[in-house]
């Protein structure tokens, strides 16, 4: 029966079977010999050897094994990494780590504006600076926010929307914009002060849509 010779360990294996080769390649001595070999040949030559290994896999039409296949009890060759891209062979991956080569073993999530893979959840874009994300209500609309003027919470026609919570005896004037998050509107004279005006509003100017008696600090 033919025997398999390991160039890294300089030994003959007892059998030339796939199971014997996998058991030998996952051994501690073999992995250490592979790392020592690629550390001795240098960075440029190690990169050329890795390229030749990957090209040989591509020429034969075989999927490259995963790095996890080097551990005992792991799955066999042919697994792929994140994003559907194949990983380097065990020897090449160990050599790349030893020689300090940068190998993309995983891919970051897609940026905003690009479609994700089927079945992948993409987080929503971050809120503007200084503003917490609004809570979601029915239909994905922000709770306590009725949308733009003339639209309801579901983006339909005029009318509807989530109404603000009022104290007993209060009436919402026409054109009043409810506060976000379903906050309760206090009555006039209850010590409630509006936040300072944002950029673009002159100091002391009334806010658009605010009821009488509600003005920025310092307004008369």
Swiss-Prot record:
Belongs to the U1 small nuclear ribonucleoprotein C family. Residues 197-220 are annotated as: Disordered. It comes from Tuber melanosporum (strain Mel28). Its main location: nucleus. Gene3D superfamilies: Classic Zinc Finger. PANTHER family: U1 SMALL NUCLEAR RIBONUCLEOPROTEIN C. One of its GO terms (cellular component) is commitment complex. PROSITE patterns: ZF_MATRIN. A zinc finger (Matrin-type) spans 4-36. The lineage of its organism: Eukaryota, Fungi, Dikarya, Ascomycota, Pezizomycotina. Keywords: Metal-binding, Nucleus, Ribonucleoprotein, RNA-binding, Zinc, Zinc-finger. This is U1 small nuclear ribonucleoprotein C. SUPFAM superfamilies: beta-beta-alpha zinc fingers. U1 snRNP is composed of the 7 core Sm proteins B/B', D1, D2, D3, E, F and G that assemble in a heptameric protein ring on the Sm site of the small nuclear RNA to form the core snRNP, and at least 3 U1 snRNP-specific proteins U1-70K, U1-A and U1-C. U1-C interacts with U1 snRNA and the 5' splice-site region of the pre-mRNA. Residues 208-220 have a biased composition (Pro residues). Component of the spliceosomal U1 snRNP, which is essential for recognition of the pre-mRNA 5' splice-site and the subsequent assembly of the spliceosome. U1-C is directly involved in initial 5' splice-site recognition for both constitutive and regulated alternative splicing. The interaction with the 5' splice-site seems to precede base-pairing between the pre-mRNA and the U1 snRNA. Stimulates commitment or early (E) complex formation by stabilizing the base pairing of the 5' end of the U1 snRNA and the 5' splice-site region. The keyword Protein biosynthesis does not apply. GO terms for biological process: mRNA 5'-splice site recognition; spliceosomal snRNP assembly. InterPro entries: Matrin/U1-C_Znf_C2H2 (IPR000690), Matrin/U1-like-C_Znf_C2H2 (IPR003604), U1-CZ_Znf_C2H2 (IPR013085), U1_snRNP-C (IPR017340), Znf_C2H2_sf (IPR036236). One of its GO terms (molecular function) is zinc ion binding. It is found in: Nucleus.
């Amino acid at each position: 029966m033919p025997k398999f010779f390991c160039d890294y360990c300089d030994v003959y294996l007892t059998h030339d079977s796939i199971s014997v080769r996998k058991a030998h390649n996952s051994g501690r001595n073999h992995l250490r010999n592979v790392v020592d070999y690629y550390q001795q040949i240098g960075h440029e030559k190690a990169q050329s050897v890795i390229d030749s290994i990957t090209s040989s896999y591509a020429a034969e039409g075989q999927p490259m094994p995963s790095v996890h296949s080097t551990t005992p009890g792991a799955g066999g060759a042919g697994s792929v990494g994140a994003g559907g891209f194949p990983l380097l062979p065990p020897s090449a991956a160990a050599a790349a780590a030893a020689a300090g080569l940068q190998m993309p073993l995983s891919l970051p999530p897609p940026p905003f504006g690009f479609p994700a893979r089927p079945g992948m959840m993409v987080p929503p874009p971050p809120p503007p600076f200084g503003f917490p994300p609004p809570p979601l209500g029915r239909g994905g609309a922000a709770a306590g926010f009725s949308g733009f003027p003339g639209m309801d919470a579901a983006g339909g026609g005029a009318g509807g929307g989530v109404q603000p919570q009022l104290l007993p005896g209060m009436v919402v004037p026409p054109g009043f914009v409810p506060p976000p998050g379903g906050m309760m509107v206090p009555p006039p004279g209850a010590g409630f002060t509006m936040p300072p005006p944002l950029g673009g509003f002159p100091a002391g100017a009334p806010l658009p849509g605010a009821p009488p008696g509600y003005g920025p600090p310092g307004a008369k």
